[in-house]
Amino acid sequence: MVSKTSLRETVRGHRWRELGEVLAARPDLLNVRDERGRNWLHLCCATPGDPADSIRTADLLLGLGLGLEDAAFTEGEWKATPLWFSISWGKNYPLAEHLLKLGAAPLYSLFAAIWNNDSATIRLLLAYGAKVDEDSAPGESPLMGAVAWSRFGPAATLLEAGADPNLVNPKGDTALHMMLKKGSAIEHFRLFARHGARGDIPGAKGETAASILRRKRDPAFRALADELATA
């Protein structure tokens, strides 16, 4: 007898042939969701595995009517779509690329790729139209998220793609202010300086990043203040 539990394992195992047979016999199980709102497509995408089998499984479920943009749950404008699951949990670049080729919106997933330190997927999302400074997370750009999580590889990828290094978060700080508070290494400040970060923007406490840098003991940090852009 087929149960939701056994079907869950079939989906997570990307056993697409078996899944097709089960759903042909029990079409009433197609639209089942778990306690977090995830359907079978979300679970398929969230589970790491063989790329080819995961793509066949996803195509089967899409062909049976599950939605490419259907969200398991939402937070404001942000949505946990199948694409997001393929990137955040599945870490499955080929599946993510396949979903994008099918027309999946490249929204909501940049932060997941940043958290995973996955610059290749960041570039993939941008190539399919993701906005480098998207605002799906209230008050925080992807670049700000990269700095907050000390993901400076992704930060470099975003800056190279044109991310604005001078945005201000809801607290009133720029990325430079955040890095000063975190004690980030000087090479990360130099990265931002190379991409036009301004040192003359007041932060939450009214001080500019340049003025804070000039008070540092390390002469390299003091010198960096003069490398920062100004209005």
Functional labels for PLM-detected ranges:
Residues 15-23, 50-63, 90-100, 118-127, ...:
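Ankyrin repeat structural motif
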Residues 34, 72-76, 103, 136, ...:
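Ankyrin repeat boundary/linker residues
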